């Protein structure tokens, strides 16, 4: 994208210099094609005596139309035009650096220059609608009655750029339209008419736009743009480029890109202070460290990719995003925030990825009351929610439900899918609630060793030991959560995996249905070791920081688990305040070996030169526990785990105990030292 921007950015200084040196010196110069004249004031301000009207439209043609800082007046006294058209017929671009004012009755103003229009400190007064365009002007004359005609204005655009310089563009307008092949905004564009029906609209790319000139210049209840068509020209250019110094502020803001493949890139601020922000393109839309804020709705749409990086997108009402792919990510200044006072709706024909950013619907007041609607994500492909190194990935509905539907997988990686209401996840593929884990040496399997050294008298120097390494968790403070406060958690998928994460409903049910396998597992990290060295004396030392993370499913009500092939709880905990029902051919309750260390380096043994230590191995987790009953529709297998219910445990196929939960010392071969025989 940046390569496409270079020609436009580099051309701006040349345009400014070229116009200021020659064409700007000429200012506003009629070409003689219309009855238009110009007079110059002592301050340098120019007055344009506009041509008589046809159907309420005054058409004026120029070889040069540039406005210096002294400004220019369009004299509408005695003409009473509703619309004043100013079109440049030469090859000179236009530069507007001052005020353009309508003398006399208020009028709509159109400036059309196919060679390009640059505004740097320009403003408009006593105007209704203002159109800046690089299109060619034509007219559509409509006979309303004998001798009565309405002349509509048509702008056909296929080239030229509108550039807003650092000085910006301002006015109190019914509406501002920017129509060009390309649009570059390097300064503030402000329409001070605060109304949800007035604003700023950009139509960028090849297009033909028709304006109904019958409307009064004071009528902000009707849109005078009655039609826009586009040939669908293919382009990979960045059609709209807004720099960090640029911005758009109005009652309503619309950016519409017509060319196929052309996109929008914004680092600036877009603010609709009374209505909506709408950005529609046929290429990629990229908002990086910029902001979109609307007092009503924000709508973003493209068949391409929408990427929000460190961006702030907020709406008082709804946020609606539709794209081929949607990607939210954080950067060094901070996370992307996509939030709405009511509902957030993201729809993708591809994938949706949220990395280290916040998607939130609704608000929570200081007194704890909540308002708002749902967070709804729908993707034909995968939905991925992950945390970054610095920021959590969060999807949160403050008052409604959080609902994710994917044609592929739903992956919640070290991130959080939350709701004060209900949570619903539906995937044609797998649902994974996981944390990042780097495996230890030997795959977490224990390793024992013995080393025999030199001898002294009848003593042999022997060292024996034991090590186990479960690896590390990248960020133990960023566990994966799927949680609902006042509603159920419902998950439907091909396979379900909760590895190191937490799934919970505070006061309702958790229901998980997997077409194939259900797996709930704690992730174990840390190392355990034991070393014993004997020669004349024996010295032993033990250590363990083995810790389980997550693997928790809990509900204030009932828990329902359905698996087509197998249900496994590996070192985790499944707990229900109500009942647990597992509908699967076979259900495994599997403990994972944890370790604790005991060291005795003082006392009687140490007095004689020896120290004592021990490693205790125990089964951790693998339990299904309910205050109500636990019901298995198939077989149950205990491998270091457990099934327990306050109202009993039943299994249609019976329960087989392969290994009951145990706690035993790890046995290491002992070797004789001088004092060992006293306490072996």
Show the residue positions of the predicted features:
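Binding/recognition "hotspot" determinant
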Residues: 159-160, 164, 220-221, 282-680
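Solvent-exposed adhesion/ligand-recognition segments of exported proteins
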Residues: 2-6, 15, 20-273, 280
């Amino acid at each position: 994208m940046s390569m496409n921007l270079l020609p436009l950015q580099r051309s701006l200084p040349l345009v400014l210099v070229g116009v200021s040196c020659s064409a700007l010196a000429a200012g506003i110069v009629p070409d003689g094609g219309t009855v238009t004249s110009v007079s110059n004031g002592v301050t340098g301000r120019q007055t344009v005596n506009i041509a008589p009207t046809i159907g309420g439209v005054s058409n004026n043609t120029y070889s040069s139309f540039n406005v210096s800082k002294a400004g220019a007046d369009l004299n509408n006294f005695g003409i009473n035009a509703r619309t004043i058209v100013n079109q440049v017929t030469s090859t000179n671009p236009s530069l507007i650096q001052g005020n353009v004012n309508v003398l006399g009755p208020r009028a709509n103003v159109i400036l059309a220059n196919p060679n390009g229009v640059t505004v740097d400190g320009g403003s408009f007064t006593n105007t209704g609608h203002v159109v800046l365009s690089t299109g060619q002007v034509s007219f559509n004359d409509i006979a309303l009655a004998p001798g009565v005609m309405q002349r509509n204005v048509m702008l056909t655009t296929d080239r030229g750029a509108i550039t807003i310089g650092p000085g910006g563009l301002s006015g109190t307008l019914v509406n501002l339209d920017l129509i060009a092949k390309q649009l570059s905004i390097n300064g503030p564009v402000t329409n001070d008419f605060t109304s949800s029906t007035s604003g700023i609209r950009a139509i960028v790319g090849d297009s033909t736009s028709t304006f109904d000139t019958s409307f009064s210049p004071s009528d902000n209840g009707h849109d005078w743009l009655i039609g826009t068509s586009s040939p669908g020209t293919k382009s990979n250019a960045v059609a709209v480029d807004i720099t960090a110094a640029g911005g758009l502020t109005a009652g309503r803001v619309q950016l519409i890109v017509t060319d196929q493949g052309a996109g929008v890139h914004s680092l600036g601020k877009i603010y609709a202070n009374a209505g909506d922000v709408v950005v529609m393109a046929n290429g990629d839309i990229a908002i990086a460290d910029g902001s979109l804020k609307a007092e009503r709705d924000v709508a973003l749409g493209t068949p391409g990719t929408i990427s929000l990086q460190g961006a702030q997108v907020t709406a008082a009402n709804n946020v609606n995003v539709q794209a081929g792919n949607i990607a939210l990510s954080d950067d060094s200044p901070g996370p992307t925030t996509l939030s709405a006072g009511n509902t957030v709706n993201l729809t993708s024909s591809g994938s949706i990825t949220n990395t280290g950013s916040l998607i939130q619907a609704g608000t929570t007041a200081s007194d704890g009351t909540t308002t708002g609607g749902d967070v709804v994500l729908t993707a034909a492909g995968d939905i991925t929610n992950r945390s970054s190194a610095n920021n959590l990935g969060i999807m949160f509905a403050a008052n409604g439900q959080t609902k994710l539907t994917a044609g592929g997988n739903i992956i919640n990686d070290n991130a959080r899918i939350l709701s004060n209401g209900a949570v619903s996840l539906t995937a044609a593929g797998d649902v994974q609630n996981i944390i990042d884990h780097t495996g230890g040496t030997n795959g977490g399997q224990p390793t024992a060793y013995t080393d025999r050294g030199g001898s002294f008298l009848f003593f042999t120097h022997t060292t024996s030991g034991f090590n186990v390494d479960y690896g590390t968790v990248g960020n133990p403070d960023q566990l994966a959560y799927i949680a609902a406060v006042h509603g159920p958690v419902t998950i439907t998928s091909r396979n379900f995996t909760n590895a190191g994460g937490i799934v919970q409903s505070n006061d309702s049910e958790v229901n998980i249905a997997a077409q194939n396998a259900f797996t709930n597992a704690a992730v174990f990290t840390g190392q355990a070791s034991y070393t014993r060295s004997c020669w004349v004396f024996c010295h032993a030392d033990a250590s363990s920081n083995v810790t389980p993370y997550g693997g928790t499913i809990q509900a204030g009500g009932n828990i329902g688990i359905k698996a087509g092939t197998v249900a496994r709880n590996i070192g985790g905990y499944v707990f229900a305040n109500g009942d647990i029902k597992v509908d699967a051919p076979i259900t495994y309750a599997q403990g994972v070996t944890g370790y604790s260390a005991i060291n005795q380096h003082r006392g009687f043994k140490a007095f004689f030169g020896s120290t004592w230590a021990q490693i205790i191995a125990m089964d951790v987790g693998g339990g299904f526990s309910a205050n109500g009953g636990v019901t298995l529709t198939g077989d149950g297998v205990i491998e270091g785990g457990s099934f327990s219910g306050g109202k009993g445990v039943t299994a249609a196929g019976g329960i087989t105990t392969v290994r009951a939960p145990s706690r035993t010392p790890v046995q290491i071969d002992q070797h004789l030292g001088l004092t060992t025989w006293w306490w072996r």
